[in-house]
């Protein structure tokens, strides 16, 4: 159950999210990259690579990671941490599936 102090926003239906591909979603002043992984889970992260600002929704997904399309930085979709030898992080967002809809919770 979602706490009354948080916001829950519908970002679409599950079937609208292509598996292993990113989708750009705008919520208020935030630009997010949303991914449906091969296991059916949904992940949402900040849509800019911390290195040079690459659009992560355009990156290649492998397992629990997205690779920045600009310089191939490997970023965890679980915690937003850039994998070594590079370093940095992006903000991650909680997602929630209710029925056929996907929600961003923040």
Swiss-Prot record:
Asked whether the keyword Transmembrane is assigned, the reply is no
Q: What induces it?
A: Positively regulated by TnrA under nitrogen-limited conditions. Induced by ArfM.
Q: Which UniProt keywords apply?
A: 2Fe-2S, Cytoplasm, Iron, Iron-sulfur, Metal-binding, NAD, Nitrate assimilation, Oxidoreductase
Question: What is this enzyme's EC?
Answer: 1.7.1.4
Family annotation (InterPro entries) = Rieske-like_NirD, Rieske_2Fe-2S, Rieske_2Fe-2S_sf
Q: Where is the Rieske domain?
A: 8-104
Q: One cellular component GO annotation, for this chain's record?
A: cytoplasm
Would the keyword Ribosomal protein be found if you checked this record's keyword annotation?
no
Quickly give the catalysed reaction. NH4(+) + 3 NADP(+) + 2 H2O = nitrite + 3 NADPH + 5 H(+); NH4(+) + 3 NAD(+) + 2 H2O = nitrite + 3 NADH + 5 H(+)
Q: Name one GO biological process term.
A: nitrate assimilation
An example Pfam family from this entry, by short name, is Rieske
Annotated [2Fe-2S] cluster binding lies at 49, 51, 68, 71
Instruction: Kindly list the GO molecular function terms attached to this UniProt entry.
Output: 2 iron, 2 sulfur cluster binding; metal ion binding; monooxygenase activity; nitrite reductase NADH activity; oxidoreductase activity, acting on paired donors, with incorporation or reduction of molecular oxygen
Q: How is the cofactor bound?
A: Binds 1 [2Fe-2S] cluster.
Question: What cofactor does this chain's UniProt record say it requires?
Answer: [2Fe-2S] cluster
What subcellular compartments does it reside in? Answer: Cytoplasm
Q: How does it assemble?
A: Associates with NasD.
Q: What does this protein do?
A: Required for nitrite assimilation. Required for activity of the reductase.
Check the record and name the PANTHER family matching this protein: 3-PHENYLPROPIONATE_CINNAMIC ACID DIOXYGENASE FERREDOXIN SUBUNIT (PTHR21496:SF23), FERREDOXIN-RELATED (PTHR21496)
Q: What is the name of this protein? A: Assimilatory nitrite reductase [NAD(P)H] small subunit
Source organism per entry reads Bacillus subtilis (strain 168)
